[in-house]
Design a protein with these regions (language model features):
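Short Gly/aromatic-enriched secondary-structure transition segments
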Residues: 50-60
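Extended, low-polarity transmembrane helix blocks
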Residues: 1-51, 65-85, 89-159
Length: 159
């Protein structure tokens, strides 16, 4: 309860997450794929999370840098904007945005595999790609399609 005597808007989400493990997984993945891309995107501008190699542009494959009309630093800033938008999109509509994040992660994996030294990060990002696809599948149950109403039951029928 809030101080106004009304139930907290998050109380229902937390109770449902405790009683329905799949819904709990959906909520955790949604929060993670909202916050983490936004934080990583912001870091493309502030470089607080990485200082080597040469900040974020050190993770950009040369062939991709050569394709970009921008400098590697500015290319990574564009990447940062895309990551921020992806995180916001997951917050708004994970049913669709999770597939966009998965495709984005696939692109990052291709980038990392095309030059040596970052295979461990590519493997980690593959795990994130699988988690994004899992979020998309869970969102098909818990996030209504555009123009449709949410399921009225706490545990929708899985087909």
């Amino acid at each position: 309860m809030t101080t106004s005597g009304l139930p907290s808007p998050t109380a229902g989400v937390l109770e449902r997450a405790r009683s329905d493990p799949a819904y709990g997984a959906f909520v955790l993945l949604r929060v993670g794929f909202t916050a983490l891309p936004i934080l990583m995107g912001l870091d493309k501008f502030f470089n607080l999370l990485t200082t080597s190699p040469a900040n974020w542009e050190g993770y950009l494959a040369k062939w991709i840098a050569d394709l970009s009309p921008l400098s590697p630093v500015h290319t990574m800033m564009v990447v940062g904007v895309i990551e921020i938008v992806a995180g916001i999109a997951v917050a708004i509509k994970p049913r669709y945005a999770a597939y966009i994040v998965a495709a984005w992660l696939a692109g990052i994996i291709v980038n990392l595999l095309t030059f040596s030294g970052f295979y461990d990060i590519a493997l980690r990002d593959f795990g994130l790609l699988l988690a994004a696809l899992t979020l998309a599948r869970l969102a098909s149950l818990y996030d209504p399609a555009w123009g449709r109403h949410a399921a009225t039951t706490a545990n929708p029928v899985v087909r």
